[in-house]
Amino acid sequence: MENTINTHQIDHICTDIETFKDYFLGHNYNENMFNNDGTLNKNYNSFKKTGLIAQIFEEHWNDVYNEEKEKIDLYRPNAPLEVNKIIDCHNKNLGCSIYECPECHDMVFIGHTCKSRFCTSCGYKYKLHRVENILETAYNCKHRQIVFTMPHELWPLFFQHFEIMINILFEAVNRTINSILNDTYKTRKKIKKKKKYSSKNKYTPGFFAFLHTFGRDLKWNPHIHVLIAELKMTEDEKICKKWNYFNFDALSKRFQVILLELLSKELGPSFNKTKNEQFKKHKNGYYVYAEDKDFKDFKSGVEYVTRYCGRPAISENRIISYDGNNVTFCYNDHKDEEYHEVTLTAKEFIMTLLRHLIPFNFKTIRYYGFYRKKHKNHDKMILMIDERKHKMRRQFLQYRLSILKFFNRDPYRCPKCNVEMIYACEIIKGG
């Protein structure tokens, strides 16, 4: 077989399309691999078709950015790069790996991914990794979900100053849980009198905090979901005790006081009027939702609260139609599960998604208490983890196994011959 490629001898990376094409001249490659001008045909064989959300951005992004450039650059400066990533995901612009069938010698392109949390495909994979990280860290005990919310009057602050305000929100949740556990604060009245309480906690909780910036209707609504272990570590670091009683009224009032005090410290006297209005309007504190039950299936609980932490605000299966100008999507209202349909122009849809774009390297999932890896007692507490969780379940998140699991198809087997394909070479980004 003189015209076939001896892929076992290939051990290089092609840096441009012409080098790649020249290499295969005289060999048995599909004539559709290249366009007439010699460029790589992005639609050849297994190049992934553009997803619907990526398609909407590709068709309308330039117009939207030109019209809203000042606002986008001010509030979401990483938007242009992230949008270009999702448009290029899985296509030739990010490069690809090429595999050859040793029987029929057909070739398959597997496009490189953008690895952006804003991408529906890569964001979902990011979420799966986060779920596995938490499952491997969490102790073999009951956990409970608590949701910390705030009134809509404060939402604009958290949009305009995202990183600073969201960090304050996380810190308020952390202080609230620790203060409830240790009675660091009693009432707002005593705080105003500056009564001192011991800042050294007698107990340490363990919990994961997850940022959600939207509800099912995609409106801006920043809030924190918490999965907390029904355990507390004693001050002498020797014993863990059960902790399964949560005073929800106290949580609501405590969270309000701590959050407003932190915001006041950050924003200064200009926030005093708003703070006083908040105390008058919300006398019972901010709404803290905490079901009086635990997650018996902890994995289900983790998957539930992480579903929005690593992907765009909407999944493509919720988009009912797109006619090139308007997007219609659906959702079930969280309160009564009533079905709703919403139609937005493409520009409105794009701007809605951009509201929830997370800044570079910003952590939307955080570990607190004895779940922090830097906690001095972490090595002792790790003994409480179910032994099964020591197994490396991340292997199931690898590309090949993920495709097998969800689509019952091996991407590295020839669709014609059903034999395992062999790695041929790689085209790098910019080639």
PLM regions with names:
Residues 1-431:
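Beta->alpha loop/short-helix hinge microenvironment recognizer with preference
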